[in-house]
Amino acid sequence: MTSLSPLLEKFRAHLEDEKGSSPHTVRNYLIDLVDFERYLVERMKLSLLSGTHAAIRGYLGTLSTDHAPASRARRLASIKSFYKYLVRQKLLPASPAKLVKSPKLPKTLPKVLPVEEVFAILDMPDVKTVLGLRDRAILELLYGGGLRISELCGLDLLDIDRSGRIVRVMGKGSKERLVPVNAQSIRALEAYLARRGELLATIRKDQAPEAMFLNFRGGRLTPRSIARHLDTYVLKCALTRKVSPHAMRHSFATHLLGGGADIRSIQELLGHSSLSTTQRYTQVTWEQLQQVYDSAHPRA
């Protein structure tokens, strides 16, 4: 990323130090804002402090041909957050972005896997190897605990109470929550931990990381690596659909709801701050019910 202007440097410090935003979130905000600032300076001859409602709308208009509505909405959300910060810092009397309307987004439902497809993926890792044991434990926690991939990568050895079957995760905004997991997840984790030391063979004992999940060099596993391994297992299963780590989380929530769990409990398990975010899963199960009805009822 190019060097940041002083205002964006201050905003980055605010995101990191005060809001506790993840590195991924901070990076996305800054990418959006650097692009917006470039537009203001080069096209409008304005600065971030002199940006106007019309300039923001004009910027979004330049994105309309080659950016999806969701991408434009994210750019606007970054701009709104930035100007809200400037107002709170008394650098501006009001936000020029406040009345800019977000692009209309098509209603999309979470991508959910049938139970049998989830189980097929879980059975793919070769549990005769330490990396296979690691991947099996990762997949079990993604589905058995509904963890975000960033939460899973951030797990340390002390974050799991194996006897109590509890995982302590650091969610969005540095919000900590406790997540119960099933016995199979714990068994998979214990099998991996019994051989985890093999991944530390090239590392001095005093340099051993606290990370739960390690790569073959002994470092903390990254979200990109996990997504790549999942792609491999999906191909081995001969599934035709694309499966992301987040699809395992969606499947966790939808299968819980289908099994009778109440929406408030699922909200807590997922770490959603808003119930409306969790309520998307009720629409998924309703559509599934409609499909069952249409295929099974003699009058359908």
Curated annotation (Swiss-Prot):
GO terms for molecular function: DNA binding; tyrosine-based site-specific recombinase activity. The keyword Methyltransferase does not apply. The keyword Cell cycle applies. InterPro entries: CB (IPR044068), DNA_brk_join_enz (IPR011010), Integrase-like_cat_sf (IPR013762), Integrase_catalytic (IPR002104), Integrase_recombinase_N (IPR010998), Integrase_SAM-like_N (IPR004107), Tyrosine_recombinase_XerC/XerD (IPR023009), Tyrosine_recombinase_XerCD (IPR050090). One of its GO terms (biological process) is chromosome segregation. Residues 2-87 form the Core-binding (CB) domain. Its main location: cytoplasm. Keywords: Cell cycle, Cell division, Chromosome partition, Cytoplasm, DNA integration, DNA recombination, DNA-binding. HAMAP family: Recomb_XerC_XerD. Belongs to the 'phage' integrase family. XerC subfamily. Forms a cyclic heterotetrameric complex composed of two molecules of XerC and two molecules of XerD. Site-specific tyrosine recombinase, which acts by catalyzing the cutting and rejoining of the recombining DNA molecules. The XerC-XerD complex is essential to convert dimers of the bacterial chromosome into monomers to permit their segregation at cell division. It also contributes to the segregational stability of plasmids. This is Tyrosine recombinase XerC. The lineage of its organism: Bacteria, Pseudomonadati, Myxococcota, Myxococcia, Myxococcales. The gene is xerC.
